[in-house]
Regions:
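Bacterial N-terminal signal peptides
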Residues: 21-33
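N-terminal signal peptide c-region/cleavage motif recognized by signal peptidases
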Residues: 35-37
Length: 289
């Protein structure tokens, strides 16, 4: 018999002047001048990517001051339909190498479906990390000015947890937030600006915080140097002390492609470097000559 545990999480936030403005790294939200219902807040014009885009990354893991090639990751975007409506399907595959398995086994597959106006519709993450395997899913819907998300985590033995959440802001997942972010203009950001937004993980909705750090030239794994925007995803402990979780470096051009990610783990650190990109919609004008 499969065990089902269900919890409800209803969050009504009085957000009057909110609209999506930037989210990179994969991510960010900006305060705007219009009061919009949740469904409209989740909509945006796609100015950054197109069907057929394929981005490849090399993954490295640091263990006792030694950097080890840990595997590969790929990010692909293709056209699809969802409930008979045209949509985009974005896939992120992270595959650890056999050498890296000695330290930490990683087999992650993330999929999201977004509408043509980039609103979140569905998210799935299948993760094999060490001896644990889980599937996290989220289904998004919109009604009466609220964004609803039904979430489910399924374990290897078939048991599962479920949760329902609602928010007057748009709720994102790990990939839909990246898709939206890539179409926004970061020109208005100042170094140190903090961007907060709700994200569905498949188990619950969490408040995330990003900090804009500025610009820097970054050399990718393919030997190309890019002018990049830098964002940090941070966490806060019970005393309010800030802890860096991920640092994102994204191209300062219309593509807003992640070039490098620095991840700070409990048992070490990891990096992801851009190796190759195909099918990009715009020229890579961020390349430093």
């Amino acid at each position: 018999m499969k065990i089902r545990r269900k919890k409800n999480e209803i969050i009504r936030t009085g957000v009057v002047n909110v609209r999506c403005k930037l989210i990179i790294g994969l991510v960010a939200l900006m305060t705007g001048a219009f009061a919009l219902p949740a469904s409209a807040q989740c909509e945006a014009k796609n100015d950054a990517f197109q069907t057929g885009e394929h981005v490849m990354y090399d993954l490295y893991f640091n263990w006792k001051f030694v950097w080890v090639k840990a595997g590969l990751a790929s990010l692909t975007t293709n056209a699809t339909t969802y409930h008979s409506e045209p949509a985009f399907r974005i896939n992120l595959l992270a595959l650890g190498s056999k050498r890296a398995d000695f330290f930490f086994k990683m087999r992650d597959t993330l999929t999201c479906v977004i509408g043509e106006k980039l609103e979140p519709r569905y998210f799935r993450k299948g993760a094999e990390e060490g001896k644990r395997y889980t599937v996290d899913e989220a289904w998004f819907s919109y009604k009466d000015g609220l964004c609803f998300v039904n979430q489910k985590r399924t374990y290897r033995d078939g048991n599962f947890d479920e949760a329902v959440a609602s928010d007057s802001r748009c709720i994102y997942d790990m990939l839909s937030i990246l898709a939206q972010a890539r179409s926004y203009d970061p020109a208005d950001y100042k170094i140190g600006d903090k961007i907060k937004f709700p994200m569905a993980t498949g188990r619950k909705v969490e408040e995330q915080t990003l900090i804009y750090r500025g610009k820097e030239n970054v050399k990718a794994e393919n030997g190309t140097t890019y002018r990049c925007l830098i964002f940090s995803l941070v966490e806060y402990d019970k005393k309010g002390k800030e802890k860096e979780v991920i640092t994102f470096f994204i191209t300062d051009d219309l593509n807003h492609l992640p070039v490098r990610l620095d991840l700070y783990l409990n048992f070490g650190s990891a990096k992801a470097f851009l190796n190759d990109v195909r099918g990009n919609r715009h020229p890579l004008t961020s390349i430093v000559k």
